[in-house]
């Protein structure tokens, strides 16, 4: 493990509970295809506020889970120390998209209705069965007294325009909803 740090960190997954006694851990992947998490190396974790690079030794499927073995993690006690650590990579490793957006690109964007009402900023994204949903933290002086809005990311239908240079998303949405 080295102390390098990712320049633009992005979370791709999380280490779960131990598997067995030889230092294996379950992994929860946030990538669209769960096994794609292994396409992005090196991995970084944060321990005690410091970045550590971890090296993947091996991985395999076990029932519905994915389990991993990291170099230098030889027993259950060492693996236990990594439970719940987020798996982070440098976002520069992600492929450029011809069409569409990474969730990370939408975070912090100001959301405005087609009528010009400022709904707030994107603070999170949720995946539902049918479509993604923007989680928007409303401005402090929201006229409708709303603190948080959930707006479906339906391109063309609700989402009218995404401008990553100005960090704005224009939506056709009722601010009172």
UniProtKB/Swiss-Prot annotation:
Gene Ontology annotations of biological process type:
ribosomal small subunit biogenesis; rRNA processing
**Entry keywords, A to Z:** Chaperone, Cytoplasm, Ribosome biogenesis, rRNA processing
The cellular component terms of Gene Ontology attached to this UniProt record, alphabetical and capped at eight, are: cytoplasm; ribosome
Q: Where mainly found?
A: cytoplasm
> Which Pfam family, any one of them, does this sequence belong to?
RimM
Where is the PRC barrel domain positioned along the sequence? 98-177
Task: Give the matching InterPro entries.
Answer: PRC_barrel-like_sf, PRC_RimM, RimM, RimM_N, RimM_N_sf, Transl_B-barrel_sf
Q: Where in the cell is it found?
A: Cytoplasm
Q: Name one GO molecular function term.
A: ribosome binding
Please explain the role this protein plays, according to its UniProt record. An accessory protein needed during the final step in the assembly of 30S ribosomal subunit, possibly for assembly of the head region. Essential for efficient processing of 16S rRNA. May be needed both before and after RbfA during the maturation of 16S rRNA. It has affinity for free ribosomal 30S subunits but not for 70S ribosomes.
This protein's assembly is summarised as: Binds ribosomal protein uS19.
Q: Which family does it belong to?
A: Belongs to the RimM family.
The record's comment about this protein's domains reads: The PRC barrel domain binds ribosomal protein uS19.
How is this protein named in the record?
Ribosome maturation factor RimM
